[in-house]
Amino acid sequence: MKSGIYLGKNSIEIRETDIPTVGDNDVLIKNIYSSICGTDVAVYNHGPNTGHKIDVDGEFGHETVSKVVRIGKNVKDFFVGERVYPYPRFVKKDTRRAGTIGGFS
């Protein structure tokens, strides 16, 4: 899959990356549309030390309209083909994983 990789101030590169493995409690989504927000612009223009959790060499971007393409065997709230708008800082019932969705680093 293609991913926008943040390389530092004023530098992003599109790279081919592996499709993530789907665990029993995971949902894999495919981006249909993405947007650029104020956080993206601030980090791009001013570098990673802007108070936002964006890592150099990490996947960049977090506002998407997506489609569910695979679900883990324990997932009951989503179905393959469903369109979703993922909120990158929330993972139902498991806040340790918040921020991992969509590569929001």
Give the role of each language-model region.
Residues 39-45:
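Cytochrome P450 core scaffold surrounding the K-helix E-X-X-R motif
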Residues 101-105:
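Short peripheral tails and domain-boundary helices/loops at the edges of structured domains
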Residues 10-11, 49:
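Short beta->alpha connector loops
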Residues 11-15, 38-39:
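Short N-terminal binding/cap micro-motifs at the start of the first secondary-structure element
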Residues 1-2:
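Extreme N-terminal starter segment of soluble prokaryotic enzymes
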Residues 5-7, 45:
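Residue-level signal for short segments within beta-strands and strand-turn junctions
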Residues 20-34, 48-95, 99-100:
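Glycine-rich beta-strand-centered segment in the early N-terminal region that forms part
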